[in-house]
């Protein structure tokens, strides 16, 4: 059994780390590089950086901070935001990122996934899926441009159909962002993640909902995800990563030591 990953998520806007609730009302958390260093030293297994307005602004992720992060941390990190070509991806990877993640650009151009995987290898191509549960239709639906509340829009894709599609195109990992749970700290959407796990043959990362230390053990044991991404509980010091890993070990969940 591979060790389960603990992944702090840093949403970036205008050069600062921010955090919202259900992708809205973002507050400033702090500067990117010191936070990245802090999490690496605390025992995080990986970091994810989302330039949350890049796609909706029609630009590529602000690259000015990527190389600075690579200089101060020694754990893998993934960068996302408006990456829509092989050249965009190459620049970010050359600056020191270990993975790149695409979301809205993949919805516009699904074959981008295959082109990136062919050039850089499947292992470093992550596809983010922003999924919203519609209670009226009882469906999980894919959304795009979620970093900008004025431009956020539903796509025509069912969440699980889209996951199957991107895996078939060469995605090496899926991050499932459960929008209903984002920032509210009520637990991961276990039911949605279980359904996604059944459709996903590559590593699956849960995102959205972590509020207590037990939420992490629940998502690993019940949904069989490979990693859990969280923001608020780490940014606000609610759950120290060291304590989380000790607890998971006690629950017989394999994690890397801090």
From Swiss-Prot:
Catalytic-site annotation from UniProt: 11, 130
Top-level lineage group: Bacteria
A biological-process GO annotation: L-histidine biosynthetic process
Assembly behavior: Heterodimer of HisH and HisF.
Function comment: IGPS catalyzes the conversion of PRFAR and glutamine to IGP, AICAR and glutamate. The HisF subunit catalyzes the cyclization activity that produces IGP and AICAR from PRFAR using the ammonia provided by the HisH subunit.
UniProt record similarity statement: Belongs to the HisA/HisF family.
Protein's name in the database: Imidazole glycerol phosphate synthase subunit HisF
Species annotation: Colwellia psychrerythraea (strain 34H / ATCC BAA-681) (Vibrio psychroerythus)
Biological classification of the source: Bacteria, Pseudomonadati, Pseudomonadota, Gammaproteobacteria, Alteromonadales
């Amino acid at each position: 059994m591979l060790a389960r990953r603990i992944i702090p998520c840093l949403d970036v806007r205008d050069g600062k780390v921010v955090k919202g609730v259900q992708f809205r009302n973002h507050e400033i958390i702090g500067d990117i590089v010191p936070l990245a260093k802090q999490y690496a030293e605390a025992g995080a297994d990986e970091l994810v950086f989302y330039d949350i307005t890049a796609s909706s602004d029609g630009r590529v992720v602000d690259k000015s901070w990527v190389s600075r992060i690579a200089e101060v941390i020694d754990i893998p990190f993934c960068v996302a935001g408006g990456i829509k070509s092989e050249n965009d991806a190459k620049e970010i990877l050359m600056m020191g990122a270990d993975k790149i993640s695409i979301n809205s650009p993949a919805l516009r151009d699904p074959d981008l996934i295959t082109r990136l995987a062919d050039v850089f290898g499947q292992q470093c191509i992550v596809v983010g899926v922003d999924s919203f549960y519609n209670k009226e239709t009882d469906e999980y639906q894919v959304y795009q441009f979620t970093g900008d509340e004025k431009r956020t829009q539903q796509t025509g894709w069912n969440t699980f159909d889209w996951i199957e599609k991107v895996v078939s195109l060469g995605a090496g990992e899926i991050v499932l962002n459960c929008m209903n749970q984002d920032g509210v700290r009520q637990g991961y959407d276990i039911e949605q993640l279980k359904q996604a796990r059944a459709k996903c043959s590559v590593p699956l990362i849960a995102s959205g909902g972590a509020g207590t230390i037990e939420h992490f053990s629940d998502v690993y044991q019940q949904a069989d995800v490979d990693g859990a991404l969280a923001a608020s509980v780490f940014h606000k010091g609610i759950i120290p990563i060291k304590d989380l890993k000790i607890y998971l070990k006690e629950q017989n969940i394999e994690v890397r030591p801090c």
